[in-house]
């Protein structure tokens, strides 16, 4: 058995309605709680196990079956490749203090990102010596989302506080003062607003560009409920990279994401953003370990390339709390390397693939900066 295996259990008995909303896809036989899952090439083995008792030969104190969702053994430890040192470093401390004083939210904190120490300290965390480029993803429109995706740690409410009208200018002033060349702006979903928050996003981008014309701005957006006018408003605000995450494969959309999100809706948003502006760089992200098959991942990558998405990130899903979806599989670093090579073979200009990669992971690294600037330079002669 592999050194780091993911044991999968299912609560017994299993009702048809529970299975419909579950991530499991095994063959189930009446009167039996034993389930068999397929293993994947170059990936973590998933073992056969009984749903109502601990794995054979393992006396686990306090063992109990997991909740209604299929998932790994609650007593299993994360593989070594997912363990990170505690966030630290001079740049990290300075940036955290600055964000606190300015009352700015970051997705790094709110979504419990495992890379916060590495990104905020310019790559000096668990990722190695780094390149000195500190990256923080500013979260606009508050810290409360109107949607309830079952993978996300951000708090939710049907009626979040109204947007802060001064936030766009305050954010622009703060970011301009940091002396960075690349910034990522994201937001919670705001289905309570007529434009989904697109105008607030656009104001922030315009304010940033006025204060620091040379800065590169990436916006990681919601789907604005599929409102393409809202997409156009943001895409024409001066941003350089339009990012929207498809999150998972088609078959798992309703299980993983809020019902208001949809696979084709996300593709439509990305396609429209690409067509709104010549030279627009588009980007998306896929989580792995939720029960998807290799063929489904390949199809999702092909669908993204078919609408000319330039940048793709792939990372391991990690369960934020017991209330969220459980991890179905720990994907090995070697398999993530395979996905990187496969993505590059499809024509993505840049693929970041690894267990701890997230959609904004090291977004401002030099390769991405050079890619955006090169596209701008190629477009410049046509505008003269």
From Swiss-Prot:
Source organism, top-level taxon: Eukaryota
Binding site for [4Fe-4S] cluster 2: 145, 149, 152
GO function terms (MF aspect): 4 iron, 4 sulfur cluster binding; lipoate synthase activity; metal ion binding
EC number(s) from the headed UniProt entry: 2.8.1.8
Keywords recorded for this protein, A-Z: 4Fe-4S, Chloroplast, Iron, Iron-sulfur, Metal-binding, Plastid, S-adenosyl-L-methionine, Transferase, Transit peptide
Encoding gene per record: LIP1P-2
Reactions mediated catalytically: [[Fe-S] cluster scaffold protein carrying a second [4Fe-4S](2+) cluster] + N(6)-octanoyl-L-lysyl-[protein] + 2 oxidized [2Fe-2S]-[ferredoxin] + 2 S-adenosyl-L-methionine + 4 H(+) = [[Fe-S] cluster scaffold protein] + N(6)-[(R)-dihydrolipoyl]-L-lysyl-[protein] + 4 Fe(3+) + 2 hydrogen sulfide + 2 5'-deoxyadenosine + 2 L-methionine + 2 reduced [2Fe-2S]-[ferredoxin]
BP GO terms, sorted: lipoate biosynthetic process
Keyword S-adenosyl-L-methionine carried by entry: yes
InterPro entries found in the cross-reference section: Aldolase_TIM (IPR013785), Elp3/MiaA/NifB-like_rSAM (IPR006638), LIAS_N (IPR031691), Lipoyl_synth (IPR003698), Lipoyl_synth_chlpt (IPR027526), rSAM (IPR007197)
GO CC annotation, single: mitochondrion
Span of chain positions assigned to the transit peptide in the UniProt entry: 1-48
Protein name: Lipoyl synthase 2, chloroplastic
């Amino acid at each position: 058995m592999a050194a780091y295996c993911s044991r999968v259990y299912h609560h017994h008995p299993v009702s048809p309605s529970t299975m419909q909303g579950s991530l499991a896809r095994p063959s189930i036989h009446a009167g039996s709680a034993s389930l068999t899952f397929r293993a994947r090439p170059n990936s973590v083995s998933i073992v056969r196990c009984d749903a109502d008792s601990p794995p054979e030969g393992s006396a686990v104190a306090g063992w109990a079956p997991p909740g209604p969702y299929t998932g790994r053994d609650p007593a299993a430890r994360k593989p070594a490749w997912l363990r990170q040192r505690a966030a630290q470093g001079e740049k990290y401390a300075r940036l955290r203090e600055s964000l606190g004083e300015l009352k700015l939210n970051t997705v790094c904190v709110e979504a419990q990102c495992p890379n916060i120490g590495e990104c905020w300290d310019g790559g000096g965390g668990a990722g190695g010596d780094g390149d000195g480029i500190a990256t923080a993803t500013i979260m606009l429109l508050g810290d409360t989302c109107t949607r309830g995706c079952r993978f996300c740690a951000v708090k939710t409410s049907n009626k979040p506080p109204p947007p802060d009208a001064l936030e766009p200018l305050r954010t622009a002033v703060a970011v301009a003062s940091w002396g960075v060349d690349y910034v990522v702006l994201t937001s919670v979903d705001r289905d309570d607003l007529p434009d989904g928050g697109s105008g607030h996003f656009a104001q922030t981008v315009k304010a940033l560009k006025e204060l620091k014309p040379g800065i590169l701005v990436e916006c990681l957006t919601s789907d604005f409920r599929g409102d393409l006018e809202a997409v156009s408003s943001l895409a024409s605000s001066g941003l350089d990279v339009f990012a929207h995450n498809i999150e998972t494969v088609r078959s798992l959309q309703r299980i993983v994401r809020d019902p208001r999100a949809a696979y084709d809706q996300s593709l439509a948003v990305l396609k429209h953003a690409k067509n709104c502006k010549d030279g627009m760089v588009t980007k998306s992200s896929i989580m792995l370990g939720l029960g998807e098959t290799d063929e489904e991942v390949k199809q999702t990558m092909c669908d993204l390339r078919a609408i000319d998405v330039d940048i793709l990130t792939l990372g391991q899903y990690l369960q934020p709390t017991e209330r969220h979806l459980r991890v179905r599989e720990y994907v090995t670093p070697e398999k993530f390397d395979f996905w990187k090579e496969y993505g590059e073979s499809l024509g993505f200009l840049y693929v970041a693939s690894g267990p701890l990669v997230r959609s904004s992971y090291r977004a401002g690294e030099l390769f991405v900066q050079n890619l955006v600037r090169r596209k701008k330079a190629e477009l410049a002669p046509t505008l003269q």
